[in-house]
UniProtKB/Swiss-Prot annotation:
Biased segments, Acidic residues type: 749-769
Other information: Present with 259 molecules/cell in log phase SD medium.
Keywords, sorted A to Z: Membrane, Phosphoprotein, Transmembrane, Transmembrane helix
InterPro entries named among the record's database cross-references: Alr1-like (IPR044089), CorA_cytoplasmic_dom (IPR045861), CorA_TM1_TM2 (IPR045863), MgTranspt_CorA/ZnTranspt_ZntB (IPR002523)
Record GO terms (molecular function): magnesium ion transmembrane transporter activity
GO process terms (BP): intracellular magnesium ion homeostasis
Protein name (Swiss-Prot/TrEMBL): Manganese resistance protein MNR2
Phosphothreonine modified-residue sites: 177, 571
Biological classification of the source: Eukaryota, Fungi, Dikarya, Ascomycota, Saccharomycotina
Homology family: Belongs to the CorA metal ion transporter (MIT) (TC 1.A.35) family.
Length: 969
């Protein structure tokens, strides 16, 4: 019978409200005995109670606590010295419950609290006066005070630290749990199975709630999760902090690149993945449309606010309808409009470049202001307002569009089977009335639509102004190639014409939407938006990425035009200055006599108005100094801000930190993402490369199959060909510099020889023509003195100007060499790594890759590589020529300096001869000029004087003959 009871008791939980009375009495006696013994030790020992408690816990652990056995879960259980006590229970709610004797913080029990709620720790309650609720399943005799309750709170806290048993416990309020007061006074009963089930259920529901919350609050800031009070949301927020978040210097308040993530496909799901995910584009289009319409309404109300008073005064007496609130349509919201252009229609008279597109510059209706009556003028103004509201003229574009995007049409949709290309400032503007994004980007849908055929419209007509019921979704196929898609099946995806979406200067939010819709990898998104500088080809699962660098052709044209205008203005200024000088010289020569007569009067008048001018200048300078300080500070701040904005824009465009110096090319990064049925291109500045490729595709669509790989090849080819004109200009400049340097010294020698020959010829002709008119020349010399002096002055000034211009040309030559070398090095920097990129690109085609199918484009890529290698070798050759020209220029400068030194030596030699002749004369004259008695002083004849003069002449002749023989002059 005892064995049956023991077997039956093994299935009973460890805690039960009903147990046998002998066992309870035995436990009470043991507990009372241990308590009395422990209290006696505390009274007899002089040490602190905490130290005694610590010692007793170490040596007499079994005597102090009633928990002697530890199960496999690491929990303590009550037992006797021999075996575990099994308590019988009839309560089914406590079956399988374990006892956890770890101390826990008290929790409020006012209402049900889930496990997922945040548990806030509260201060430890005083154990001297416990205020626990009376458990439902315990008898009043079981409510014994703990032995530890006699300790103070600080002593109890130190004891708990030594025990290292401060843990948090969670209690499921929905299940019946009981508390008991034992020696620990904080023991909690936990149903582990129910707890684990509850945690698993909350975890699954928390994941679902978080996924719904992400879908609902997509693109919001991370700071919105700070006020959440559940542990599941907090844990999910902590997990989100460890996700990949690439750094972005252009982060906005609405979105950031850390929201861009690669959604992993569920391997167990049988639903096929749709590419592209047009639902993301549809949601973004709705949000963008609502935002732009609200902005347009605000702008229209602000624009027409100034006409409110006139409308209120004149609406009662005049006919017509004038709406108080503006009617907002797609025409009034230019961001939602688009323009359709056919690139081949602009090819007139051999023109290979399209005209500039300006569809938004609508012609404003001129107002007639010649009427005298104010009533007629008001009626005209109101009729003009009605036309503007109803028809859409004089659209006031939002300032954020004009300031942020000078090139308004940032999104361009192209397909070779369409008659025209769609240009739009926004993603939503690409859609025609009644059209969806599936009709643009899903090959199976637009191929079926094209096979059914559409109504053609004029390619240059703006589509937003046409009604939706009269406009088809997209234009049909051209009549030249009707059999292109006649036999096409949707299964044969290779025959579907690919779409091409060209994006210029995308925002961070647009980049995020496109990445999610087309399944672009986060690394690709980071490279595009942060401006990857290195040129490369990367292969992904669904696409491959090509990073290719070009140069800003538009900026280069502006620089050339500005430089040409500057040169023309400089030449005009030089001519005008020379003309003014000649006129001023003639005026001064003619008015020289009049100026001498008017000197006295001008001096008198100058003495009167000069002090007044000085006083006015002093006053203006005092006022100017007070204003210049503030204006200079504002100007400096504005210039620094403008410089920072330019650097930021250039960094986004080319990836470089600083703007290139004058003479260097501005790099432009072009990113090409090639899918099987589509192409995405990104660039951050306007460039003509996409226009050229679209025109080329339309011209050659009857002779080749335009695929996505061909579009990528055509873009690379057009970017490479854009460097050819620059290299030709560099070649011409290099050869001109070399020829000018080699002819620099020859021109100087020829000019000197020509001038000497002309002088000698003029002298000989004078002697031959007038051999007997020397006396007449001498007599007429005094009369022609003024003319000779003026002529000599003009010739000396002309020679001085010629020398100055020559030296200036030499200085300009050095500047030309430096600028040309700078240009060569900038192009070499852009072309240096392109050969390796093309080589890797061709390798992708030659190998068996799933993402890059076999085609004939690999043959053309080899031709591009040959072009690049040829251009690089030509640039290296030009660099060597410029280096040699630079050395030749320095040699010419040394020759010129040597020539100058030789001329100076000649002048010094002539001065030496003159000194040799004059020095003896100075000695003789100095001796006879002393204030002493000299020979011949008292003679009345001129004998001594004549003799001294003759001696001096003979001495000068002898000195001249000696120096001429000695130095070879």
């Amino acid at each position: 019978m005892s064995t049956d009871n023991s077997q039956k008791d093994e299935g009973v939980p460890l805690l039960s409200p009903y147990s046998s009375s002998p066992q309870l009495r035995k436990k009470k006696r043991n507990q009372k005995r241990r308590k009395d013994k422990f209290v006696g030790h505390l009274k007899s020992d002089s040490r602190r109670p905490t130290q005694l408690l610590h010692d007793n816990l170490q040596h007499n652990h079994g005597q102090i606590t009633d928990f002697d056995q530890i199960d496999s879960w690491g929990m303590l259980h009550e037992s006797d010295s021999t075996s575990n006590d099994i308590i019988k229970s009839e309560d089914p709610s406590l079956k399988g419950a374990f006892i956890d004797h770890r101390p826990s913080m008290s929790q409020p029990r006012e209402g049900p609290q889930s496990v997922s709620s945040t548990v806030q720790p509260q201060p430890i309650m005083k154990f001297s006066t416990p205020s626990y609720k009376k458990p439902a399943g315990l008898r009043p005799s079981d409510q014994n005070r703990s032995l530890v309750s006699d300790l103070s709170p600080s002593e109890l806290e130190s004891w708990l630290k030594r025990r290292k048993s401060v843990h948090k416990s969670f209690v499921d309020e929905n299940s019946p749990t009981d508390r008991r007061q034992s020696n620990a006074n904080n023991d909690v009963v936990i149903d582990v199975d129910a707890l684990m089930n509850h945690v698993n259920n909350n975890a699954s529901t928390g994941v679902n709630d978080n996924s719904k919350r992400r879908k609902k609050k997509r693109g919001s800031d991370d700071s919105s999760n700070k006020n959440s009070k559940s542990t599941s949301s907090d844990s999910n927020d902590e997990e989100d902090e460890y996700n990949s978040r690439p750094s972005s210097s252009l982060s906005s308040n609405n979105s950031s690149l850390d929201d861009v993530c690669l959604v992993l496909d569920d391997e167990g799901s049988e639903v096929p993945k749709a590419w592209p995910d047009c639902t993301v584009l549809e949601e973004f289009s709705k949000e963008e449309t609502e935002r732009l319409r609200s902005q347009a309404i605000q702008d229209a109300e602000a624009f027409h606010f100034q006409y409110d008073e006139d409308e209120e005064d004149g609406t009662s007496n005049e006919d017509g309808i004038l709406f108080s609130k503006p009617i907002v349509t797609n025409i009034d919201v230019p961001e939602l409009g688009n323009r359709r252009v056919n690139e081949t229609e602009n090819l007139k008279n051999g023109r290979l470049r399209p005209k500039r597109i300006a569809p938004w510059h609508l012609i404003q209706r001129p107002m007639v202001l010649g009427s005298n009556s104010t009533k007629d003028s008001k009626s005209r103004i109101q009729s003009g307002l009605q036309d503007n509201l109803l028809v859409g003229r004089n659209i006031q574009y939002p300032p954020h569009i004009i300031s942020n995007n000078p090139e308004h049409f940032r999104f361009t949709y192209f397909r070779v089977d369409l008659d025209s290309t769609v240009h739009s400032p926004t993603i939503s503007g690409l859609l025609q009335p009644g059209q969806k994004f599936q009709d643009l980007f899903v090959a199976s849908i637009y191929s079926q639509d094209n096979s059914a055929g559409h109504i053609k419209t004029h390619p240059n007509s703006p589509t937003p102004g046409i009604k939706a019921e009269t406009v088809s979704q997209l234009q049909g196929l051209t009549a030249k190639n009707p059999s292109t898609l006649s036999s096409m099946s949707v299964a044969n995806i290779e025959d579907v014409p690919p779409f091409w979406l060209d994006v210029s200067n995308p925002t961070e939010e647009e980049m995020k939407i496109l990445s999610k819709a087309f399944g672009i990898h986060p690394l690709t998104t980071e490279d595009i938006f942060l401006g990857e500088v290195r040129e490369k080809v990367e292969l992904f699962r669904d696409y491959y990425l090509i990073c290719f660098r070009s140069f800003d052709i538009v900026a280069e044209k502006h620089v050339r035009r500005r430089r040409k205008e500057k040169q023309e203005s400089a030449t005009l200024d030089h001519e005008s200055i020379s003309r003014r000088k000649s006129q001023a010289y003639g005026a001064t020569m003619s008015n020289e006599s009049n100026a001498n007569n008017n000197n006295s009067t001008s001096n008198a008048s100058r003495s009167k108005w000069l002090p007044s001018i000085l006083r006015a200048r002093r006053r203006s300078s005092a006022n100017r100094t007070t204003n210049t300080s503030s204006s200079s500070y504002k100007r400096r701040v504005k210039s620094e801000k403008k410089k920072m904005e330019e650097n930021e824009k250039f960094k986004r465009k080319s990836g470089d930190r600083h703007k290139p110096r004058e003479g260097e090319l501005e790099p432009l990064n072009v990113y090409i993402i090639v899918f099987r049925t589509g192409v995405l291109t990104f660039h951050f500045a306007p460039t003509p490369h996409p226009i050229n490729v679209r025109r080329r595709a339309r011209l050659l669509k009857d002779y080749l199959n335009v695929t996505s790989d061909w579009i990528a090849y055509a873009l690379i080819d057009d970017i490479t060909d854009a460097f050819a004109p620059m290299i030709e200009l560099i070649e011409d400049e290099v050869y001109e510099i070399e020829d000018a340097i080699l002819k620099m010294h020859q021109s100087d020698d020829s000019s000197d020889s020509d001038s000497s020959d002309s002088d000698s010829d003029s002298g000989a002709s004078d002697e031959d023509a007038f051999p007997f008119d020397v006396y007449s020349k001498k007599t007429s010399y005094s009369s022609a003195k003024s003319s000779v002096s003026s002529r000599s002055m003009s010739t000396s000034e002309a020679s001085f100007n010629a020398n100055l211009i020559g030296w200036k040309r030499k200085g300009d030559m050095l500047r030309r060499i430096g600028e040309c070398r700078k240009r060569v090095m900038s192009i070499l920097r852009l072309l240096g790594s392109k050969a390796d990129v093309i080589k890797g690109f061709a390798k992708r085609y030659n190998e068996q890759w799933e993402a890059s199918p076999q085609s004939e484009i690999a043959m053309y890529l080899g031709d591009i590589q040959d072009h690049i290698v040829t251009m690089v070798s030509s640039l290296n050759h030009y660099e060597k020529l410029l280096s040699r020209s630079h050395s030749n220029y320095l040699a010419q400068i040394n020759i010129d300096m040597t020539k100058v030194n030789n001329d100076m030596n000649d002048v010094l030699g002539k001065i030496t001869i003159l000194g040799t002749i004059v020095l003896p004369m100075n000695v003789i004259t100095g001796l006879w000029g002393m204030n002493v008695i000299v020979p011949g002083q008292y003679r009345d004849s001129l004998t001594w004087f004549i003799g001294i003069v003759l001696f001096m002449c003979m001495l000068a002749c002898s000195a001249y003959m000696y120096t001429k023989r000695r130095f070879g002059f």
